[in-house]
């Protein structure tokens, strides 16, 4: 009781915190004891999470590096195993493949040219020049590939060439479309006289060539093509001129043959007869 009286003049018991020697400091986040423990726990948890994240990142980085190393190793092994594939073994094979590529390109270009002419994207004059050149190149290509390409239709099938217009122009007919249908619009007297003289000269030159036995395909074919073109320039003949049909048939026949082939005696005699008959009809038409 004396103890109580020494600390409390009113004889009341001392408060429960009177025996605390060093009270905890207050904190704006809450009660002192709870706050400190929570803060410490949070700090510990954060440290643990950070350590876990760092460990995960390190593991991911290590996995990525291992994966990259594995890919690089496989790539190096793959490059080491690659072998050069040659399309040809010698110069002869190389030339053959180049000639095949040229034939392929000629057919494709002719197909595009025919479609452009149908759409009126190219003038008749330019079409005739380009088409005649392609036909000549086609004949030369056939000569170079006579042992490899015996059938152009089969060649187009093997290489998936769906070029019907080119096949008709190069293989079946062998002359530009402008030679089938007259596209020349010149009608003056001077131009008419020039066209007549040119046609007469070509008739005579072609017939003389046959009489001299110069009957190889690469020799007769250009003469007949020039004659056909010259007759088309003479509009006054009309589309039913008999001589034009006969010459067109002969051009188609020659187009089926190789450039190095020659007409036999029967073919030469028949061609000469048809030309002579066509020339006589043409000459009579001039006088009439």
UniProtKB/Swiss-Prot annotation:
This is Vacuolar protein sorting-associated protein 28. Keywords: Cytoplasm, Endosome, Membrane, Protein transport, Transport. Component of the ESCRT-I complex (endosomal sorting complex required for transport I). Component of the ESCRT-I complex, a regulator of vesicular trafficking process. Residues 1-65 are annotated as: Disordered. Residues 191-287 form the VPS28 C-terminal domain. Residues 1-10 have a biased composition (Polar residues). Belongs to the VPS28 family. It holds the Pfam family VPS28. The keyword Acetylation does not apply. It is found in: Cytoplasm; Endosome; Late endosome membrane. It comes from Dictyostelium discoideum. It is a peripheral membrane protein. Residues 18-64 have a biased composition (Low complexity). GO terms for molecular function: protein-containing complex binding. Residues 74-181 form the VPS28 N-terminal domain. GO terms for biological process: protein targeting; protein transport to vacuole involved in ubiquitin-dependent protein catabolic process via the multivesicular body sorting pathway. One of its GO terms (cellular component) is ESCRT I complex. The gene is vps28. PANTHER family: VACUOLAR PROTEIN SORTING 28, ISOFORM 2 VPS28 (PTHR12937), VACUOLAR PROTEIN SORTING-ASSOCIATED PROTEIN 28 HOMOLOG (PTHR12937:SF0). The keyword Cytoplasm applies.
């Amino acid at each position: 009781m004396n103890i109580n009286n020494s600390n409390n003049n009113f004889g009341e018991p001392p408060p429960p915190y009177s025996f605390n020697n060093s009270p905890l400091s207050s904190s704006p986040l809450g009660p002192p004891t709870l706050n400190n423990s929570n803060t410490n726990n949070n700090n510990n948890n954060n440290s643990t999470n950070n350590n876990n994240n760092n460990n995960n990142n390190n593991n991911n980085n290590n996995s990525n590096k291992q994966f990259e190393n594995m890919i690089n190793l496989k790539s190096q092994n793959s490059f080491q195993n690659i072998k050069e594939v040659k399309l040809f073994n010698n110069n002869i094979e190389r030339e053959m493949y180049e000639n095949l590529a040229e034939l392929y390109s000629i057919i494709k270009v002719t197909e595009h040219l025919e479609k452009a002419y149908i759409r009126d994207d190219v003038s008749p004059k330019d079409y005739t020049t380009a088409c005649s050149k392609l036909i000549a190149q086609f004949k030369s290509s056939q000569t170079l590939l006579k042992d490899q390409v015996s059938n152009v239709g089969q060649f187009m099938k093997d290489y998936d060439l769906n070029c019907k217009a080119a096949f008709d122009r190069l293989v079946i007919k062998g002359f530009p479309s402008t030679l089938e249908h007259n596209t020349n619009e010149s009608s003056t007297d001077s131009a008419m006289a020039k066209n007549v003289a040119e046609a007469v000269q070509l008739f005579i030159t072609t017939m003389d060539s046959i009489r001299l036995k110069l009957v190889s395909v690469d020799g007769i074919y250009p003469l007949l093509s020039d004659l056909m073109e010259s007759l088309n320039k003479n509009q006054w003949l009309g589309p039913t001129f008999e001589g034009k049909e006969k010459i067109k048939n002969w051009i188609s026949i020659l187009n089926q043959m190789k450039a190095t082939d020659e007409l036999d005696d029967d073919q030469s005699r028949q061609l000469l007869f048809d030309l002579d008959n066509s020339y006589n009809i043409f000459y009579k038409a001039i006088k009439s």
